[in-house]
């Protein structure tokens, strides 16, 4: 291990972890340098904190502790926890780093033994393209505090990052949410109490959800967001400033309104 200025790691040949963390999870990993590449292998690791940082667009990354790391990292981890109970198994793939930042990546795993998980990152002409596919993504969705009781569904995420600006598209199909506090409050104010009760009780099922949005700095602009379901459909747009302001506008259409219009 060689440490340079600003406490950045200049060189690392071997690093082993064999501990029990505060979540009472065993962490057994080996990070080993072979020629100019690294192999990250292990039987189990608690990565719940890393997952949360990724989902909230945190700039923190374990690779930022290295100084100008240019290498390939090959992964083979038996069990990678994404929260206290859920985990990715048989995590395999590779990550290419340039200047300590992810340049390309191709990872696959099984979520809770039998659900598909795939992550691909490709960089071309200074544009980074990220694609994420998750079957039954509830363990990841639960990190967003404004959604509770998410069930079922398939998630497809794609983003394009260029010069600090990120354009993203998120799709989720055939899912149920038990509680969305902000939406439930809006429905109550609109005298749609029956739907509000569903949203805080058994939940409302949606067949399709899609959101196109752009992120720059601390501001996320939602160009269009819609959700379609048998009880209610939603169309919204607006913007969100991190830890500050939320401004959304749109239309809520209950199924009773649609039925009356058709009849």
What are these regions (language model features)?
Residues 1-220, 225, 229-263:
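Membrane-proximal interfacial segments on either side of biological membranes
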